[in-house]
């Protein structure tokens, strides 16, 4: 299966090499295996465990343009072709840049970089000129689609600067820096807003407020392979002895979560499982917010003024996320974007290729 799935990239790299050679520039095509990319054994969603790009480096030294098929590598144990899953091509590019000691890894897409919000929802979103890898990770993890989370994680781990730009324009894109930047007076407090419709809300009602019960619940979910995004536990009512735990989980894991918890309702004394698939998450991201306590007040006031109810709230040092009704998510993004003065005076975002990436 992986051999078949990787065929498209192999054909594309070969055709591109032929075209470049015909234009009078030497070019050499490499499969992931030929480029020295080794993976673990998780077929279809493998991780890169090593890169030895000797042939790629030699081709470049000899004046050839090296073209490497993304999304694939060689299983470290079996030497079989393996595929990397979502974000595999971006991650391949970053891995090669790191192993070759490149000054920068440029990721080409169909827009001029990262924007303060999805331009399809907020046409006046601003282009972000520079952003930290930590902020980019938060945006990517909470719905921003331009750059995949795995690629950003790899870049941060190996200190590879990223430049995200358009394939159809010479404009400067967005620089993602991995070194710690000094805070300045001019530094933006908020970098951007991400939104995500791919999570469902599950509330576990009537959990005993005693040591061990929450641990048992999350052990069951982990055993079923359920991924969890947000966790919120209510404070137990005085004298009641029970609490509620609310989760947001990727929609593909909802059935497994409900099944495993339903089977343990009697054991754990759970009184009810409440499932809501009609929710969306808005995440406000910015390294500057940690020293500005008014940020959360402005966020909640903007949602209040727009008449939007909040289901759940979670946060990190540089992010505040709120779960709202799905049919009000776009309104929430626009309201918060305007409240934090992120709107541009004119439309900056242009989708050149229409791929939606």
Could you say what each language-model-derived stretch is?
Residues 160, 165-167, 171:
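Internal glycine-rich alpha/beta core junctions
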Residues 173-357:
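A conserved regulatory-domain signal marking ACT and ACT-like small-molecule sensing domains
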Residues 104-108, 162-164, 229-230, 311-312:
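Short hydrophobic alpha-helical runs that function as membrane-insertion/retention elements
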């Amino acid at each position: 299966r992986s051999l078949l799935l990787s065929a498209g990239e192999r054909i594309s790299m070969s055709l591109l090499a032929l075209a470049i050679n015909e234009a009078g520039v030497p070019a050499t095509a490499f499969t992931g295996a030929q480029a020295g990319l080794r993976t673990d054994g998780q077929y279809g969603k493998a991780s890169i465990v090593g890169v030895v790009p000797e042939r790629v480096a030699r081709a470049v030294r000899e004046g050839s343009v090296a073209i490497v098929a993304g999304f694939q590598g060689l299983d470290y144990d079996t030497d079989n072709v393996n595929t990397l899953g979502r974000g595999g091509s971006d991650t391949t590019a970053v891995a090669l840049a790191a192993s070759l000691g490149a000054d920068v890894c440029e990721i080409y897409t169909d827009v001029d970089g990262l924007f303060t919000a999805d331009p399809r929802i907020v046409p006046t979103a601003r282009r972000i000129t520079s952003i930290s890898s930590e902020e980019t990770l938060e945006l990517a993890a909470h719905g921003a689609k331009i750059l995949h989370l795995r690629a950003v994680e790899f870049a941060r781990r190996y200190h590879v600067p990223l430049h995200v730009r358009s394939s159809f324009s010479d404009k400067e894109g967005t620089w993602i820096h991995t070194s710690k930047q000094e805070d300045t007076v001019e530094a933006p407090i908020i970098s951007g807003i991400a939104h995500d419709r791919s999570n469902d809300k599950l509330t576990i009602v009537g959990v005993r407020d005693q040591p061990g019960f929450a641990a048992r619940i999350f052990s069951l979910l982990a055993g079923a392979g359920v991924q969890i995004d947000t966790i919120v536990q209510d404070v137990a009512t005085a004298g009641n002895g029970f609490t509620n735990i609310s989760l947001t989980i990727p929609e593909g894991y909802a059935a497994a979560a409900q099944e495993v918890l339903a089977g343990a309702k009697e054991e754990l004394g759970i009184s009810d499982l409440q499932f809501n698939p009609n929710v969306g998450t808005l995440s406000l991201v910015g390294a500057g917010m940690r020293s500005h306590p008014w940020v959360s007040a402005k966020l909640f006031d903007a949602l209040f003024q727009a008449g939007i109810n909040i289901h759940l709230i979670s946060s990190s040092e540089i992010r505040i996320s709120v779960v709202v009704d799905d049919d009000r998510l776009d309104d929430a993004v626009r309201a918060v974007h305007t409240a934090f003065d992120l709107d541009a005076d004119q439309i900056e975002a242009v989708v050149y290729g229409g791929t939606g990436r």
